[in-house]
Regions:
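Non-heme Fe(II)/2-oxoglutarate
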Residues: 105-165
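Non-heme Fe(II) oxygenase catalytic core, chiefly the N-lobe of the double-stranded beta-helix
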Residues: 1-97, 108-113, 120-132
Length: 165
């Protein structure tokens, strides 16, 4: 378990939705190429209201960008990250749906309607992501005792304790 997040429309209504891999915010391009081949972060999205959903480039969690994807995502050669990418699959979501995808896949949230979604991120425990775990997202010991199968959280707590020792 890594954290939970709430996603909503940007404050600036002029902001366009943009293609990215979550790992691009923490790694340079060379390291991104390694990360997507070695580890994965699982992203679970549950919309609170109907929303335009997500757009994904299938298979990109296991391969590097082609020229078009790279240019758009990195805003090179006259492209911007909000440009359409051929091969993108839009997945509209209704309130209560569950979308599961790799955060390392090229993707973008689609803005519009009253977008509000709860996202849950789960990391590969073999990876070096424990420093991204937000303590505020972890259950207390009292909460853990009420969870029928707390192994996911127990694993994260164990990894965090190893980091601190």
């Amino acid at each position: 378990f890594m954290n939970t997040q709430l996603f909503f429309n940007p404050v600036n209504p002029q902001q366009k939705d943009f293609w990215h891999r979550d790992c691009q915010y923490d790694y340079d391009v060379d390291d991104q190429m390694k990360v997507i081949m070695e580890t994965q972060v699982l992203h679970l999205r549950v919309p609170i209201f109907d929303e335009p959903g997500m757009e994904l480039i299938p298979g990109t969690h296991k391969r590097w960008d082609n020229e078009e994807e790279y240019n758009v995502r990195q805003e090179e050669n006259g492209k911007v990250s909000s440009d359409d990418i051929s091969g993108g699959k839009q997945i509209p979501l209704a309130a209560g749906d569950l979308l599961v995808f790799s955060a390392d896949m090229i993707h973008r949230g689609r803005y519009g309607l009253d977008r509000l979604a709860l996202d849950i991120l789960i990391f590969d425990s073999a990876a070096d992501y424990v420093d991204y775990v937000d303590d505020d997202c972890l259950p207390t010991p009292a909460m853990l005792s009420n969870i029928s199968d707390p192994r996911l959280f127990m694993n994260t707590l164990h990894l965090k304790s190893m980091l601190c020792s």
